[in-house]
Amino acid sequence: MENLFLKYSIPELVKSLEKRDLLFIDIANTLIKTISDVEKNTHAWVCSDTDKIKNSFLQAENEFNRNGVSQPLRGIPFGVKDIFNTKEYPTQMGSPTWEGFTPGNNARVIDSLVFNGGIVAGKTVTAEFAVHALNETLNPHDVTRTPGTSSSGSAAAVAR
């Protein structure tokens, strides 16, 4: 399967979806495979759910078919650092104290991305409360190293 995220820029992906040169499910499948491939070696993701991803892309496609309104991030997935609240996934802040906590709301920045067509792909690993302590995330280019602390999951998830 071709990695669409390496072939197209964000504006090109959006345009291809809106012209129907690409299908929303193509992006969903690329995302799911990318997360799976990265996760095997890096432990970059706290949580991501294949069914939620497919459902979000299906909803985005249905909405586009209904109203056809262009959005700057239509169908573009994004990972969320696990210190930002999301409706779909727990916000644990890298801490066992907050394990399983689901806030029931999105942080404003998440609402803004979703309002503009973005799709939540899941939550990426962070150090406890996003400070100092190392975690289990590994550098995808050298698994004997870590990408750091606070944004380690985000860094490992996008490294190529």
Task: Show which residues each predicted segment covers.
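An N-terminal boundary/leader segment
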Residues: 1-55
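Generic hydrophobic alpha-helical segments
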Residues: 13-17, 60, 154
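Long amphipathic alpha-helix in the N-terminal Rossmann-like dinucleotide-binding domain
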Residues: 51-58, 114-118
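Short glycine/serine-rich loop/turn segments
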Residues: 74-160
